[in-house]
């Protein structure tokens, strides 16, 4: 999993935009992505905020992050580590916490939370520790899903809509439900907006 702190350049931007076109049939052009996709704007601002956060200009980083949240409806903490080609589709209501790590070519739909578990009364014992998820490469997280705590979601896993993840997820698993269960459908159809086909059938057969 590669993490980008700050990597400007035309090729990086072109690759990012092309990766969205490859995943979203509604994407018509790179210009339309830049002008109209909140997820693209949120990543652009996060790269800048993350640069300032790494340089210890924390107030500037938070101001940029808050402006991005106001503009896009997407909240990404400046210290979150995000790899290449993260596609936040629709975007409204997405929250990515401070110690989140996200790999390459990840897709996240609206209303997703990459959050911590309920804080203790004394927050000092949670500073400088891993509190948020690690999302490995090629993961898809469906709308409304909650991935909570310092768990790891393995490569190419798929998280169904509104699923709640509080434990590690194996590579290529398909997780649905509350609490989420692995329904073992890694090679079958997956719907990030609703119930994955045959998930109820499998559950009833267990």
Model region roles, listed by residue range:
Residues 72, 77-78, 83-84, 89-98, ...:
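Left-handed beta-helix
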Residues 38-39, 44-47, 80, 86, ...:
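Solvent-exposed, flexible loop/coil residues
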Residues 60, 64, 107, 113, ...:
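Extended, non-globular alpha-helical segments
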Residues 122-123, 156, 174, 188-191:
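Short, glycine/charged-enriched secondary-structure capping and boundary segments
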Residues 1-72, 187-206:
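Terminal amphipathic alpha-helical/low-complexity segments used for targeting or macromolecular assembly
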Residues 123-131:
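Regulatory activation segment
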